[in-house]
Amino acid sequence: MLTHFRWALLGAAAIIAAQAGQARAFWPFGNDARLDLAPAYGGVCEDCDLSGRILAGARMSNSDFSGSDFSNAVLTRADASHSEFEGADFSHADLTRARLIDASCPRARFEGARLERADASGADFTRAIFHDADVTQMKFDDANLSGADLRNARGLTQMQLDEACGDRRTRLPRGLRVQRCD
C-alpha cells in the first residue's frame, strides 16, 4: 500500500515529465500511461511525437514545434499563436476553433484535419497541404497561401480567400482564386 506521500511523489513526477516534453510517464500499475494534458507550454519541441494526444485548450503560443507529429491529435480551442510548425504533420487532427494567429506553418500537412472556425490570421501556410481538410469558416485574414495545396479542402469559400494571398503555385478548387502576395 502506497502512502499519501508516495502517491504525491508519483503524481509530481508525472507532471514534471509531461512539462519536460516527455511523451510517456511512469504509471505504478504496469505499462506506460499516456498523459493527455492541456498545459501551458512555451519553448522548443522540434520533431516531437504528439500524435493522438488530447491537447484541447492547450496554450502553446510562442513555441517551436517544427517537424513535430500532431497526427490524430485533438487541439480544439488550443492557442498556438506566434508558434513555428515548419514541416509539422497535422493529418486528421482536430483543430476546431484553434488559434493559429501569426503561426508559421510552411510545408505543414493538414490532410483530413478539422480546422472549422480556426483563426489563422496572419499565418504562413507556404507550401502547406490541405487535402480533404475541413476549413469551414476558418479565418485566413492576411494569411500567406503561396504554393499551398487547397484543391480538395472542404468548406473553402471565395470570401475566405479574399482576405488571404498566394501565388501562381497556390492550388485551389475550381472557380476560386486568391490575390498575389506583395
Residue ranges and their predicted role:
Residues 15-23:
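C-terminal segment of classical bacterial N-terminal signal peptides
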